[in-house]
Regions:
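A positional/architectural concept
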Residues: 6, 11, 15-64
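Glycine-rich hexapeptide-repeat left-handed beta-helix
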Residues: 1-10, 44, 52, 58-60, ...
Length: 196
């Protein structure tokens, strides 16, 4: 965490910001927010508001032009490697892995922006839209079933901060896999798997 120009980041005690993430300046992070390693959240030229229940995954960048405020509304889900630059992301919207959302764009509530999508400046995406491509194009509406699936995935990230605070710690690696090593249980399925 870094103060800048008199602005000190504000991070709710229930949030988890990985030690390898960088949060700078005029940033406000709400309850149960997850920020992954390698994320850069730069409130140096403007403000960044990350509402309760959002997640900003590994290697994401959030930034803006001078004087702009970036707002991630409640339960927004920013996938691995995505860039949000000077945009507004609506409540319970998902930005897919390595997608880019540019200045003054708005992603409507409950929308899903596909992986590798490029949302150009000023684009206004209506609520509950599925958006793909470069440049981005709305291809269909988010069904109730798809929204429930997305919300379930975000809930996993909303539970993660408490689990990380409880059990994440530096360690020395083992040199071999021990007998009887525990396995992770399957607690979520891909969209395709839910459809079959």
């Amino acid at each position: 965490m870094f103060a800048f120009d008199g602005f000190v980041p504000v991070i709710h005690e229930s949030a988890f910001v990985h030690p390898q993430a960088t949060v700078t300046g005029n940033v406000v992070i709400g309850r149960d927010v997850y920020v992954g390693p390698g994320a850069a959240i730069r409130g140096d030229w403007g403000g960044i508001v990350i509402d309760d229940g959002c997640n900003v995954q590994e290697s994401c960048t959030i930034h803006m032009f001078p004087g702009v405020t970036v707002h991630l509304e409640r339960s927004a889900h920013i996938g691995h490697g995505a860039i949000v630059h000077g945009a507004r992301i609506g409540e319970n919207a998902l930005i897919g892995m390595n997608a880019v959302v540019m200045d003054n764009a708005t992603v409507g509530a409950g929308s899903i922006v596909g992986a590798l999508c490029f949302v150009p400046s000023e684009m206004q995406i209506p609520p509950r839209s599925v958006v793909v491509g470069n440049p981005a194009k709305v291809v269909k509406q988010v069904s109730d079933e798809m929204l429930a699936w997305k919300t379930e995935g975000t809930a996993l990230y909303q539970a993660l901060p408490a689990r990380l605070r409880e059990s994440l710690h530096p360690c020395e690696p083992l040199r071999e896999v021990p007998a009887g090593r525990a396995q992770h249980e399957m607690s979520y399925r891909t969209w395709k798997e839910t459809r079959t």
